[in-house]
Amino acid sequence: MLTLLFTIVVTLQDPPPQGGAPATPAAPVAAEPMPLAAVDDKAAKAAVDTFNKAAKGKRSMNERMKAVEELAQGANKAFVKPLVGVAENDESLVVRKRAVVLLSLQPAPEAPRALRALLKSKKVEAAPAVLAEVVSGIARSGYDTTMWPDIEPLFASDYAAERVGLQEAILALVTKHKEHKAAKLLLDNLDEPIPADEHDPSNPPAEYWKARWYAWKAWREKVKEALFALTGQRFSTAAEAKAWLDKNKRK
């Protein structure tokens, strides 16, 4: 009954793709930011002092954005702390996201360490758009496989529409870095999501399946691309992909 109701709702609003129907065109990919030139410590300290003084007054969003841009015109470890502060606390998601981008262009090891910490920040967790930028920043600057346990749970924790960008950022990271630990996540999200047993009392409600279906529709082609990056193969179903992976396990 649950499957029937969900199918009816989805069919009426936005029919699932059939057979060989063309995929929904992907959204334009934002251009990667250019690396920043190094700033000497004296100039960096002066920039941070100016930023901190300006932060004490009441400012518009445009003024706050300008301050962030002026702070991080270059790269220096001194910029990491104030950028983290903006990423967590600014009133504007636009300003917070820009701070994360600029943070990702700061020197290692300070910047990658700060980005990893932001993954666990409650303030960032409450803003999926900012969290998506954090994942993209990690992919850009210093991702290593030890970070995967912090990133993986973010994908399926919620399939609400506002988290689609985060899920796409995770898939982009997997594709870019060929993260083989993500194989199970990809298999779990390759097929059209429907309940395995609609009569199971522990089965999530219809609203869950509806949200998950629309999320899946948005990024399903990216799941296929991530699997291709890992295997060099194209798969139509999770069973097909699993059979190949089981047969070709990494040594």
Residue ranges with predicted function:
Residues 154-159, 165-169:
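Short, structured interface segments that constitute the first stable element of a domain
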Residues 29-41, 62-76, 85-88, 94-108, ...:
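Structural detector for internal amphipathic alpha-helices that build alpha-solenoid repeat scaffolds
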Residues 11-36, 235:
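Cleaved targeting-peptide boundary
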Residues 56-61:
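Charged, low-complexity interaction regions
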Residues 225-251:
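Terminal, low-structured helical/coil segments at or just beyond the last alpha-helical repeat
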Residues 1-14:
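Sec-dependent N-terminal signal peptides
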